[in-house]
A protein has these predicted regions:
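Transmembrane beta-strand segments of Gram-negative outer membrane beta-barrel proteins
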Residues: 19-21
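Aromatic-lined carbohydrate-binding surfaces of glycoside hydrolases
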Residues: 23-251
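Catalytic beta/alpha-barrel core
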Residues: 254-257
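Flexible, acidic glycine-rich loops studded with aromatic residues
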Residues: 261
């Protein structure tokens, strides 16, 4: 009888909240045991069933070892995370921030450090001391979505990461993209920013679909920051919001806000 009630309660919860998700940065290898304990003791009892892990380049890539960042999880480390998630019926989804968030403050991210030719705004220099606002409107750097060799690199690391996590989905980030369609970019300059954003979403989506995987993204670039009053972080001030009508309809859009959910 108790088992029947438990199953009924779980079924009702699944119907009301089919995705009960949590997003967190990747642990350092030294903190892996604590991370596993967190899954077992905090996420599982709260009935979390989806875990997005922001890996970025903190993985020991074999396809592109040059992209492995300062602290990096091994395949064996990832297997422990996957095992803990399976045990607790949690779907685990790895994330690498694509398009935007290729830098933070005065530090360039791993992709553009290794492949500076991918930079959308190479003429804008990183400040010694970062401050916002600034004359360059530099929040975070972006890669150029039209650079010829870009996706060959991205697809290799995405596939390797998803394989390691045994995941049927990938979170591409794509939030807070300020630099897109930069006037001085020989490939993107003068192009419609919404079309560029939609084109990059579609390119990544189509690759994932070929691999049998679902694409997840953050939703802020698909909201009009001016009409909604949400501002330029939680929504778009550079007209990418029109991409909502141009992107595939079978991807998952994660709506986030600083003060509202």
């Amino acid at each position: 009888m108790l088992f029947s009630i438990s199953v009924l309660a779980q079924t009702k919860l699944d119907s009301l909240l089919p995705v009960r998700g949590f997003c967190i940065d990747a642990p350092r290898p030294a903190g892996l045991d604590s991370f596993i304990h967190f899954i077992d003791s905090e996420l599982a009892p709260r009935k979390v069933n989806t875990l997005v892990v922001q890996i970025e380049y903190h993985f020991q890539f074999q396809t592109h070892p040059e992209l492995t960042d300062s602290f990096a999880l091994s395949k064996a480390d990832v297997r422990k995370i996957v095992s803990a998630c399976k045990k607790n019926n949690i779907r685990v989804i790895p994330q690498i921030n694509l398009l935007g968030h290729q830098s933070w403050a005065n530090r360039t991210g791993k992709l553009l450090k290794v492949y500076p030719q991918f930079d959308e705004t190479p003429d804008i220099k990183m400040p010694v001391i970062y401050a916002w606002p600034n004359s360059d409107n530099l929040y975070c750097r972006s890669y150029c979505p039209l650079y010829p060799e870009l996706h060959q690199v991205l697809f290799a690391v995405i596939d390797e990461l998803c394989d390691a996590f045994e995941s049927n989905a990938f979170h591409a980030g794509m939030d807070e993209v300020f630099f897109i369609g930069y006037d001085k970019c020989p490939r993107c300059g003068g192009r419609d920013k919404a079309e560029l954003f939609a084109g990059e979403v579609t390119t990544i989506h189509d690759h994932l679909v070929l691999k049998g995987r679902e694409m997840w993204i953050w939703g802020d670039r698909l909201l009009d920051g001016k009409t909604t009053g949400l501002g330029e972080w939680e929504a778009s001030f550079n007209n990418t919001y029109r991409a909502i009508d141009m992107i595939p309809k079978d991807l998952v859009i994660c709506d986030w806000h600083y003060d509202r959910a």
